[in-house]
Amino acid sequence: MRKRQLLACAMPALLAGCGSLPPFYESHAGTQVASLRVLTLMQGSTFVTTAARLDCKKDPDGKRLGMFSPWLAGDWTGERAGLDHKLSLPGGEGLPHNMFSEWAIDADVPFIVHASAVIRGGGSGFVTGTTYVANNVEINNVAGFTPKAGHVYEIVYGIGPAKPELRLFEVQREEGGQVTRQSVPFDLGNQGC
């Protein structure tokens, strides 16, 4: 039940009513922040994505600050999660994604992103439209970046032509409401803290 509650709070339609941001971000209101959206294009797989500040500061309870886990382990599909949002990416027209969440994160602070997946079967690739088929193969992707204040970022974790890929986009809203996504590199590589 707890997992389902958390998942519901990650849905855009319910985001405002969930008190959605972790206490860490609520307690840092007024600091320079960026917006981070996390999406997945994987279907029928078990996956978990987490992100954390690289400086690894701890709060008075000894917990790591700035840690969040948008995804929950489980065999969720877009339909089961109650979402029908479609995301258009270069090389992937209108592919549905499983889940979506949006977070306020401290700007100018390095973040590390860790995405882990256990593929249970197959799924459509979002880069070339190919299909990746495996059976209980665990794949980990780790990358980092430093968000800029006021910018909106999207992390997309999906199945590429050969394996799950972790990609970072900067989102810009132009006049007239049109939204564009520009691919940007992870600039910190495979680092931990």
What label would you give each PLM region?
Residues M1-S20:
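Sec-dependent bacterial lipoprotein signal peptides
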Residues C18-E138, V142-G144, V152-C193:
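Short loop/turn and low-complexity linker motifs enriched in small/turn-promoting residues
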